[in-house]
Amino acid sequence: MSQTPSSLRDLEHHSAFVERHIGPNDAEIAQMLDVVGHASLDALTDAIVPGNIKSPAPLALPEAITEEEALAKIRAIASKNQVQRNFIGQGYYGTHTPKVILRNILENPAWYTAYTPYQAEISQGRMEALINFQTLCADLTGMQIANASLLDEATAAAEAMTLAKRSAKSKSNTFFVHDAVHPQTLELLRTRAEPLDIVLRVGTPEEALQAECFGVLLQYPDSFGHIGDHAALADAVHAQGGLVAVATDLLALTLIAAPGEWGADIVVGNSQRFGVPFGFGGPHAAFMACRDAYKRSMPGRLIGVSIDAAGNPAYRLTLQTREQHIRREKATSNICTAQVLLAVMASMYAVYHGPDGLVRIARRTHRLAAILAAALRSAGVSVGDRFFDTLHVKAIDADAIHARARAAGINLRAIDSEAVGISLDETTTRADVVALAQLFGATADVDALDAATADALPQGLLRTTPFLTHPVFNTHHSEHELLRYMRSLADKDLAMDRTMIPLGSCTMKLNATAEMIPVTWPEFGAIHPLAPAEQSAGYAQLIDELEAMLVECTGYDAVSLQPNSGAQGEYAGLLAIRAYHRSRGQAHRDICLIPESAHGTNPASAQMCGMTVVVTKCDANGNVDVDDIRAKAEKYSDRLAALMITYPSTHGVFEEDVVAICEAVHAHGGQVYTDGANMNALVGVAKPGKWGSDVSHLNLHKTFCIPHGGGGPGVGPCAVKSHLAPYLPRAGIHAGEGQTAAIHGGGFNSESGNGHSSRIGGMVSAAAYGSASILPISWMYVTMMGSAGLRKATQVALLNANYIAKRLAPHYKTLYTGRNGLVAHECILDVRPLEKTSGIGAEDIAKRLIDFGFHAPTLSFPVAGTLMVEPTESESQHELDRFIDAMIQIREEIRAIEDGRLDREDNPLKHAPHTATQVSASEWTHAYPRELAAFPLPSLKQQKYWPPVARVDNVYGDKNVMCACIPVDAYKEDAEA
């Protein structure tokens, strides 16, 4: 132990978190630098990063502080938010998060650190939870199939619009929108429709009867609470070849007829009130359900049931050929990250309460609403009828009512000068009903009114069909039962709490506990997104400070935090480019150049903006072909809108010519969009806004430590140079069609000078600040790391990737390297030659890694037949070596196949992964020993992950699409079948 005297400042150790976040210690870093042949992190960085893009100065951010100091600072920020009683509704409702779900899902790294379930065998637990979610949504809506979540209700409605356009027989270009949809939904529909030349017509359902359109969107119950009978309208729309989309409320559907029963083709909504807090607008899991005929055009992830190699039921992502990572510019949507963690919470809420419990919650909510309506009517107040939980109170002095409400700590919905909305929910109490009645000069004897008041649900639209009949929704109603069920699912999966997840282009880094703690504070979770501005002063400060941090890290001039996924950030950036060109009288600029190596969301987002995608080449070294970009920029000079590139490239290298590429595009009037998916290789080292890029999206769920949640939530901020800043998404809703006029009046913190109030771009998310309640995670990360810590994190990410590439070089070729033979923060291992010599392909290696307890690297992207590895800075040398040892052992097994020591077909790679059931069976039929199957390295005998299923049959799953809970009898032993 060192006895060297230390100063008090040294002993205070303000940078302690940096050492917790970065995996290798200084001694390990020195050893790893020796392996890669460089004397220091700075020397390695200089050898990798082109000199003409490197930042000349450190980030102008404060120094690192400790976890305790950061938590105290953010607690002070949170205290500026005011938690009031909210009855605003408009798609957001109070709910009780069951504590067993809060602790064991939302606060559990086994759930929140998992990745999207591309590797089915290690994702069975969360896929079961998601298929429960799909069953919940399909059952309640009366549809045949539902997806595994979308970003929010408004974007889901926009996806329904484009699904209807693709699928309807009608040749019309008009989409009819119910004038009582939620205002944020209408606003987002306007954003999405305009670039696609879709005409929106807004009106009453009666007017829709006469409209010629390819589809109709109805709100049921509507935004003001009314429950309409739309069966005749559905028949009329179908007669014209159109489709009927419905935005709905899952809790209401426990009591009123399912949309599928009266003619809906597509149903969307938000599952937020199933146990997920307001969170100032997000994140929440939206959903889409549809008729079976449209399943192959439905956006978003879809969990299906297949079988494994032993013939047992197994879950997998199904119908993936619909998705952006495969179809690219022909994709049905640009949706990638969705809201898996929140969908899991909602599904567990339904499992915990079951159908009877949900009905009880719904009936109680409705009874309170009916009692309040009766009290108001008794005082001469005009209240709408045929409602579930929302009252439209008319012919009043709305300003006076709001003033009384605010004085009482109550928030009501602002509609106009003579009307307010009151939405009740699971959290509403008898005392709330009394207090609400008093605002209008009414008294409420709750028991007397309860005895005298009939329900307000329309008799002709009462639900008569059963729902959630599967045993999973009727078994786990005690806390012990649910606790053990959730634990059993978590045990089936591999997440970051067990192992590194070396997925290239995914940046699976530490999601520190201290970063996660503020997310569950009510000061962040209990703020309604439409609450009066003075109640969200803490959010205002948080958002200002985080935007400033991101501006400094990127070199851009302005940031929007509204996009609630990377794909939405891309879309926002491309919309800003489109609007900029139009403001200059250059609406004809519609060509978007995209390299063939780009992420699939890039071309999908471009086509959603009405752009024409032109693909550019890559050279033999994996670099963007600069000559091809120059040639195509010149060819399309008059029409060039943008170039989309990823930097460092998706091939894992820092390309030398990025500045020249930007100059070439600008010379022909185009804008440069730099995909920020690989920003983890840049923070503190280089800034895209300084080398010529005009716009980027970032992934806070990658670079800035928001966890992936098994496939969401995410945040995809859009960062731009000053000339594009006016075209960022506005943070408010325009008044129109008699609906509520504002979300913070277009910028709740305009006093800060951040420019929110001057932004005129269309909204890309339902809430003004997207998934606001998880922004504290990134704020905490930057605050605890400080300027020097962020730079060191980037440098260690570069080191870890090069360490893996160097140590694996005798066994696997790294497909692409940059100058000095180095990679960026990830490397592509070329295993294609091995398939020729042994019959073993990338998928076999991916599955065999499961036997070693690892999630596979990214499979066959960006180059088919390869593995892309990104270790991140958070992985220690020990964990890197463990992965390297596994890969070397796999290469030895392949060599044994090449040498004839293992059979070309009956070998541990072809049959991986191996389950405990298989290796412990009384009969073992394989030509290789059980021990090799189960324990290919001695260390695995100390700690072993057993996959719950053998290799999943993808072909069977796509031929036999089943996307609901597996019938219990499917689990019977073969001998009993």
UniProtKB/Swiss-Prot annotation:
Q: Does the keyword Secreted apply?
A: no
Q: Indicate where the modification N6-(pyridoxal phosphate)lysine is found in the sequence.
A: K702
Instruction: Tell me the Pfam families matching this sequence.
Output: GcvP2_C (PF21478), GDC-P (PF02347)
Keyword presence, Oxidoreductase = yes
| Keyword annotations | Oxidoreductase, Pyridoxal phosphate
Needed co-factor(s): pyridoxal 5'-phosphate
For this record, an example GO cellular component is: cytosol
Give its E.C. classification number: 1.4.4.2
Enzyme class name: oxidoreductase
For biological process, the GO terms are: glycine decarboxylation via glycine cleavage system
The UniProt GO MF terms for this protein read: glycine binding; glycine dehydrogenase (decarboxylating) activity; pyridoxal phosphate binding
Q: Which CDD domains match?
A: GDC-P
Protein family: Belongs to the GcvP family.
Q: How does it assemble?
A: The glycine cleavage system is composed of four proteins: P, T, L and H.
Q: What is this protein for, i.e. what is its function? A: The glycine cleavage system catalyzes the degradation of glycine. The P protein binds the alpha-amino group of glycine through its pyridoxal phosphate cofactor; CO(2) is released and the remaining methylamine moiety is then transferred to the lipoamide cofactor of the H protein.
Protein name, please? Glycine dehydrogenase (decarboxylating)
The organism is Xanthomonas axonopodis pv. citri (strain 306)
Organism ancestry: Bacteria, Pseudomonadati, Pseudomonadota, Gammaproteobacteria, Lysobacterales
